[in-house]
Amino acid sequence: MKTYSAKPSEIEKKWWVIDAKNVVLGRLASRVANMLRGKHKPSFTPHMDCGDNIIIINAEHVTLTGKKANPKDGKIYYRHTGFPGGIKDTTAGKILSGKHPERVIKMAVKRMITRNALGAKQMSNLYIYANSEHPHAGQQPVVYDFASQNPKNKK
């Protein structure tokens, strides 16, 4: 028996919509990363973009467990300006209460995807919105009820 390798014409992409209201961030991000890669499909091929398109709504209501949500000493995200001494930091709580709360989910998923050109292509199939409205109704996305799959998914 030969190893199956999907061809680009055989790949079928579905559209999913996931409600992130009161859902634990890390659990959501790991499931979304697997769906973006296509690992939930029997036709998974590691070198092809065989994952689905995912829409996440209500990103501002995602939950962080433990002390990570504390704005003062919670989970810290670092970045560097490129200049000497230019390291900047912010917390997950500040980002969630700021202008772009969807960035917390995007960063969590991005760090679970491979860091190469294929990973960038897979990340382009992720659409995150802070509130419950999205402009992708024409694609007829299927609702994926992530919160009810495991009691630990919802907080």
Curated annotation (Swiss-Prot):
GO cellular component: cytosolic large ribosomal subunit
Record carries keyword Ribonucleoprotein: yes
Pfam families: Ribosomal_L13 (PF00572)
GO biological process: negative regulation of translation; translation
InterPro entries: Ribosomal_uL13, Ribosomal_uL13_bac-type, Ribosomal_uL13_CS, Ribosomal_uL13_sf
GO molecular-function term, one example from the UniProt record: mRNA binding
Entry keywords, A to Z: Ribonucleoprotein, Ribosomal protein
PANTHER family: LARGE RIBOSOMAL SUBUNIT PROTEIN UL13M, RIBOSOMAL PROTEIN L13
Function in brief: This protein is one of the early assembly proteins of the 50S ribosomal subunit, although it is not seen to bind rRNA by itself. It is important during the early stages of 50S assembly.
Annotated HAMAP family: Ribosomal_uL13
Protein family: Belongs to the universal ribosomal protein uL13 family.
Quaternary structure and interacting proteins, as annotated: Part of the 50S ribosomal subunit.
Name of this protein: Large ribosomal subunit protein uL13
Organism of provenance: Rickettsia bellii (strain OSU 85-389)
